[in-house]
Amino acid sequence: MINKSYKHWMIVFFMCCLAASSIGLCTNAIGVFYTPVAKSLKVLKGTFAMHATLSTLATALTLLKISKVIKKYSYKKVLLIGVILSSGATWLMSYSTSVYLFYILGILRGIGVGIYGMVPITVVITNWFDKKHGLATSLALSFSGLSGAIFSPLLSSWITCYGWQMTYRFMAICILVLVLPALIVPWNIDPRKEHLLPYGYQNRKETTKVQNNKIKLLTISFLCMCLFTLLHTSITGISQHLSGVAVSIHLSVTIGATFMSFTMIGNISTKLLIGFLSDLLSPIKAVIMMILTNCF
């Protein structure tokens, strides 16, 4: 079986599209709606932004189970359900007149994002890549930042020209279109089912022996990792509010969207750099280097 082919990089392209749709559009770019929709519904921005919090919570709960689901069922069918939920919920938001309806639709969109977001993307790349795994992962996930950088000012401009209702419909169409390549082109989550091996895979003797099938979660290292993940992920939510911050200091919504684009550009460059360093050194060393860089 072949361990290097164009199909491996086609899979990366599909994952780029999924990241752009699920994380880029549904997570990184939604902040441009906070001010205009909250004003239209006559509620506080924080009250409206709660729908994004509920969406993220729904995504987190979905991610806990999705790895088992994609092993049991055809991922293309699962992917179709995910994109219908995310794009459909976004489309229905354009007709919403109550903040509570936004909460419900936000949860549905969050479930959809979880179905084809971060975990499925990394699972697919892990299955398809042995060597250059870090590069493939960072390349795919960087498109979440690229999508956010492109669509934040674009959505802001559409809101100004067409209103937030029509912009939600445009956004729903974009969410669906980005996923279409992965839905239309035949591919499998396991390369061996296509008579291929993971990229760069070589037969090697297994030297690691499993001592115990039980995994201990209540360890200091695991708890520290949970705390680190919580703290570093909480920072990403700030970018969604930059548009509202810009308006509060008498700048235009477009300027706020530009601020969001700059954060996404940093997102892209960091993911590409950490992917390169992971392959060159190791994932742990790469993360430590990036943390030290951020400290300065």
Label each residue range with its predicted role:
Residues M10-F48, T62-I66, F151-S152, L231-G244:
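Extracytoplasmic
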Residues A20, A89, Y100-Y116, L230:
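Hydrophobic core of transmembrane alpha-helices in multi-pass small-molecule transporters
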Residues T27-Y34, L217-I274:
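Extracytoplasmic gate region of multi-pass secondary transporters
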Residues T62-S74, T270-S282:
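Helix-to-loop junctions at the C-terminal end of transmembrane segments
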Residues K77-W91, K285-F296:
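Structural signature of the two symmetry-related core transmembrane helices
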Residues I107-S142:
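Cytoplasmic helix-loop-helix junction between adjacent transmembrane helices
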Residues L139-P191:
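Helix-loop-helix hairpin linking two adjacent transmembrane segments in secondary transporters
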Residues W187-Q211:
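Flexible cytoplasmic inter-helical loops of multi-pass small-molecule transporters
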